[in-house]
A protein has these predicted regions:
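The conserved SAM/SAH-binding core of class I Rossmann-like methyltransferase domains
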Residues: 31
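Conserved SAM-binding strand-loop segment of SAM-dependent methyltransferases
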Residues: 47-53
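Conserved SAM-binding loop
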Residues: 41
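Class I S-adenosyl-L-methionine
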Residues: 57-67, 77-255
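Conserved proline-anchored active-site loop of SAM-dependent methyltransferases
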Residues: 4-13, 18, 54, 64-81, ...
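C-terminal target-recognition/interaction regions appended to catalytic cores
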Residues: 210-337
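Conserved SAM/SAH-binding beta-strand->alpha-helix loop
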Residues: 34
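A short, Lys/Arg-enriched amphipathic alpha-helix followed by its capping loop at the start of a domain
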Residues: 17-26, 44
Length: 337
C-alpha cells in the first residue's frame, strides 16, 4: 500500500480522486490552514487536518510517506490573479514544499497548478521547481490536461506534475492518459428541479438588454463604461438559452452545449463570477457547481454558500486526479505495492 501525504489540501480534491482510483493508497497526513475548508473536509472524510501554517511544519517530525501531493496556491502564478509569484506569500509555499521533499524524499511527488506556472516569470519559477527536483534525484514529467476531456462540463486546463525518485523507479517514465474524447458540454449537467438562486437586481436590466439585442454593438453604449467589455464567445450562441459569466469587466456569454470556461472566484469577492443561466435568470446552484468541478452530489458543504463556492473554485478536479492515479498505478504496481 502506498502511504501518501497531502499538503494545501483544500476540500480534498486529491483525496477524492485517489480514493476513486485503482491506486492502493492510504493517507497518513494532510495539512490545510483554512478553517472553513477543514469543516468541509472533516464532514466528508471524517478526518481532521493538521491545521498549522505550512511554514510552521517541521519536516523531520512528519510521518514517512511514499507519495506527496499538493495543489499549492495558484493565485500567485495565475493570469487571472495578480501574478506576483514569490512576491506573494502564497507563492513561497513552493519553497516550503521543496524543503519537505528534500527532508522526506518520497518516491513520488504529485503537484497540480495553473498552466501559467510554466510560463511565469519567463519560465524561471517553473525551472526552479524542475531543477530542485532533478538535483534531489527525481525524474520529472508534466502534462497540461483539460478537465472537459474527463467527463467534467468545464474547461479547466491545469498542469499536472509527477516526479519519480530515480533510486526507486529507475528509468520508468510517467505516461499520462490524454483523453481526446468529445469535450463535455454543460447542458446535461443542469439541475432544473433544484432550488434557484436569483441574480442580483442590478444585473437584471443588463441581462435583459443583452438577450433582446442582436449584437454586442447594439447594446455597448447602453451599459455603464465598466460593463461595456462584452464578449459573445460562441458564434452560434442563443442569448436566450445560454450561460453568462458576469465579470468585473463585463458580461461574457457561452453556449450550454460547450464546456463552461474555468470556474473561478473574483479577487474582489466570492460571488462576482458565479455563472448565470440567461433563460432562468438565476445563478447556478450548488449542486450544479459541484458537477462543474467533478465532485459528487453527496459531497456536503457545512459552510456558507459564499464559502462553498470559493472552496469549489479553488479545488483540484477529482476526475483528473483519478485518471492520473490510474496511470500511476500501472507503473507503481510491483514497485511500491
Amino acid at each position: 500500500m502506498i502511504r501518501y501525504a497531502e499538503f494545501c489540501t483544500g476540500i480534498g480534491g486529491f483525496t477524492l480522486g485517489i480514493a476513486r482510483s485503482e491506486l492502493d493508497a492510504e493517507m497518513v497526513y494532510c495539512n490545510e490552514i483554512d478553517d472553513s475548508c477543514e469543516k468541509t473536509y472533516e464532514v466528508n472524510f471524517s478526518r481532521k487536518f493538521d491545521s498549522k501554517d505550512i511554514f510552521g511544519i517541521e519536516a523531520d517530525k512528519l510521518p514517512d510517506f511514499d507519495m506527496m501531493c499538493a495543489g499549492f496556491p495558484c493565485q500567485p502564478f495565475s493570469q487571472a490573479g495578480k501574478g506576483l509569484g514569490f512576491s506573494d506569500s502564497r507563492g513561497t509555499v513552493l519553497f516550503k514544499l521543496v524543503e519537505i521533499i528534500k527532508a522526506k524524499r518520497p518516491a513520488i511527488v504529485f503537484f497540480e497548478n495553473v498552466p501559467n506556472l510554466v510560463r511565469h516569470n519567463k519560465g524561471d519559477t517553473y525551472q526552479f521547481l524542475i531543477d530542485s527536483l532533478n538535483e534531489n534525484g527525481y525524474s520529472v514529467f508534466d502534462k497540461i490536461l483539460d478537465s472537459s476531456y474527463f467527463g467534467v462540463p468545464q474547461s479547466r486546463p491545469r498542469v499536472y506534475i509527477v516526479a519519480f525518485k530515480k533510486s526507486v523507479f529507475g528509468d520508468h517514465k510517467m505516461v499520462f492518459t490524454d483523453k481526446k474524447t468529445k469535450q463535455t458540454g454543460l447542458r446535461n449537467f443542469l439541475n432544473y428541479g433544484d432550488y434557484s438562486i436569483p441574480i442580483s437586481e442590478k444585473w437584471e436590466e443588463y441581462i435583459d438588454l443583452y438577450t433582446k439585442k442582436k449584437s454586442i454593438n447594439d447594446i455597448s453604449f447602453e451599459l455603464p463604461k465598466t460593463r461595456r467589455s462584452l464578449e459573445r464567445i460562441a458564434p452560434n450562441c442563443d442569448l436566450n438559452d445560454c450561460i453568462f459569466q458576469i465579470r468585473s469587466s463585463g458580461i461574457r456569454a457561452y453556449s450550454l452545449d460547450d464546456p463552461f470556461p474555468t470556474f473561478a472566484v473574483s479577487n474582489s469577492g466570492g460571488g462576482a463570477m458565479i455563472p448565470v443561466l440567461s433563460k432562468e435568470r438565476r445563478h447556478l446552484n450548488l449542486t450544479e457547481m459541484k458537477r462543474i468541478m467533478g465532485f459528487p452530489e453527496e459531497f456536503v458543504f457545512p459552510v456558507s454558500r459564499t464559502d462553498s463556492i470559493k472552496q469549489l473554485a479553488n479545488a483540484v478536479c477529482p476526475p483528473v486526479i483519478e485518471s492520473i492515479c490510474n496511470d500511476l498505478n500501472a507503473i507503481a504496481k510491483g514497485i511500491l505495492t
